[in-house]
Amino acid sequence: MAKSKSSRVGISLECTACRANANQPGVNRYRTTKNKKNTPNRLELKKFCPYCGHHTIHREIK
């Protein structure tokens, strides 16, 4: 049987504080999935960033 087309897609979340601060050693990214039907807009989650050392907002990137 053929597999049905899934509405879940893989996305990357990037730390906004690391991106704005140029003197950081790197940029933190998380990989997760989301359901395109339920959340069509870009996802924003508050997650821990090891480069910043505290919880920051992570936004979805392409």
UniProtKB/Swiss-Prot annotation:
Mind listing the GO biological process terms from this record? translation
Which keywords, in A-to-Z order, does the entry hold?
A: Chloroplast, Plastid, Ribonucleoprotein, Ribosomal protein
> What InterPro entries does this protein's entry cite?
Ribosomal_bL33 (IPR001705), Ribosomal_bL33_CS (IPR018264), Ribosomal_bL33_sf (IPR038584), Ribosomal_zn-bd (IPR011332)
- Ribosomal protein: is it a keyword of this entry? yes
Pfam families for this protein: Ribosomal_L33 (PF00471)
Q: Which ranges of the sequence are coiled-coil? A: none
Gene Ontology MF annotations: structural constituent of ribosome
Keyword Transmembrane in the entry? The reply is no
User: Could you name the Gene Ontology cellular component terms for this entry?
Assistant: chloroplast; ribonucleoprotein complex; ribosome
Q: What subcellular compartments does it reside in?
A: Plastid, Chloroplast
Q: What SUPFAM superfamilies does UniProt report for this protein, alphabetically?
A: Zn-binding ribosomal proteins
> Principal localization?
plastid
NCBIfam families linked: PRK00504.1, PRK00595.1, rpmG_bact
Q: Which family does it belong to?
A: Belongs to the bacterial ribosomal protein bL33 family.
Q: What is this protein called?
A: Large ribosomal subunit protein bL33c
Per the UniProt record, the source organism is: Cyanidioschyzon merolae (strain NIES-3377 / 10D) (Unicellular red alga)
Gene name linked to the record: rpl33
